Regions:
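RNase H-like nuclease fold core
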Residues: 1-48, 52, 56-66, 137, ...
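RNase H catalytic domain
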Residues: 8-21, 55-138, 143
Length: 154
């Protein structure tokens, strides 16, 4: 059976330093409607920003629906499609027995995703996917703005 998505989320994250000031962005499409979400964090990593973009996009949904999340992050896609169930059943431990990195965000994604309604799609970074390119630019600008804001306050 082919599943038709109601909502398309394209997400990306950026970090200046890793760790350092970071930004995230999400483009949500529903029919002809588009909404842009973005933000920044003072000290973070690129992976946390990728995950935050997906969290904020899913959190902004107002009803249950089929969702396609497009990301250039294999870390995010594989975490959600290959590792999450195992991590959860292992008490949030990795295969090596160590605590899963970014557990707090994985748990938020787990709660928001409702695994039967979210499809995770990987596209190559800077591969010409229009929404992904736009999210990349917005996430980078959010990271830069966060860095400027920090400089103004410190």
């Amino acid at each position: 059976m082919v599943r038709v998505s109601d909502v398309f989320l394209t997400v990306d994250g950026s970090c200046l330093g890793n760790p350092g000031p970071g930004g995230w962005a999400c483009i949500r499409r529903f029919g002809e409607q588009e909404r842009v979400l973005q933000g920044g964090v003072a000290r973070t990593t690129n992976n946390r920003m990728e995950m935050t973009a997906a969290i904020e996009g899913l959190r902004a949904l107002t009803r249950a629906c089929d969702v396609e999340v497009v990301t250039d992050s294999e870390y995010l896609r594989r975490g959600m499609t290959e590792f999450l169930e195992r991590w959860r059943s292992n008490g949030w431990k990795s295969a090596s027995g160590n605590p899963v990195l970014n557990q707090d965000l994985w748990q938020q994604l787990d709660a928001l995703a409702g695994h039967d309604r979210v499809t995770w799609i990987h596209v190559g970074g800077h591969s010409g996917h229009a929404d992904q390119e736009c999210c990349d630019a917005m996430a980078l600008e959010s990271a830069r703005q966060t860095k400027r804001d920090l400089a103004a306050w410190c």
